[in-house]
Amino acid sequence: MASTTTRRALLGGAAALGALAAGAGFAAAGRKKGHPVMSTPAITHLPPPRRVERVLRASSEHWVGDGFRVKSVITPTGDPRLQSPFLLLDHAALRRFEPATERRGVGEHPHRGFETVTFAYRGEIEHRDSAGGGGIIGPGDVQWMTAADGVVHEEKHSRRFTEQGGDMEMVQLWVNLPAKQKRSKPGYQALLDASFPRLQLGAAKARLIAGALGRERGPAFTHTPMTVFDLAFTETGDAELELPKGFTALLFTLEGELRSAEQASSLAPGQLATLARGDSTLVRLSGAAGTRALVLAGEPIDEPVVSYGPFVMNTQAEIVEAVRDYQSGKMGHLS
């Protein structure tokens, strides 16, 4: 995300991009219907569960524009050995907004070289971009925007949410693209809550957004192999699941306290655990009723990562090119 003022700073020179360390897009959706819940059998005869390798705590809260008060848990400058292909995770924790006449949010700003994934848990966000994507995401919906060769976009509270006020909670994830796809055509997926398969994993219900879990597959298209889902514990107990061998695996607690097998302490809200890769595919989690978490697993991208504000490429020369392309209007404009 970046403000309109920041856009003018960008036009004035590449150095201003250093202030754009956070940002992405929200986008279209619709309303939801119920979805059947599939049960998966207990996992047996597997190696010991994957252990927690590191626990990361979120940064201090900061405003992105005037509409999103977020904490960053991982950033593009983090260790790719722990987080690749994931670049950034921002959590806008539950916050009440009073009714207003002026829409809050973030003005137009660019991206190149990666994807932004926005999970709307509460509230409504309106998005539009220079590639033609746009619309509203509401509670339970997900937007998957592929910036790739470059887009300019904005995201603001929807008009209805602005006028009525209400609670808002969002997560925004940045996903890296391999070098061969960083200059591909931008894309946009509006994923409705009703499109996500539900699976019962012991004491928790999973909502599958991308990749495979058990016999189910999520509706999101991904450029590299990954599995993305959230968990909600419907009762106090354990949840067992399998993630592909060798994948990066991240656990982020949204609400309550989450515990991984063999972990001495629980993950508090806003904390993220990285799991050791190793040979095991088994992940065993426990939580009390009401605990919510986001689970991210992806095949690492073994390539250099060079980030500069809203651009993530492989070399410094590509960053310079991205800045010039944006300044010259090659990434488009919002009408």
Predicted regions and their residues:
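Jelly-roll (double-stranded beta-helix
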Residues: 2-335
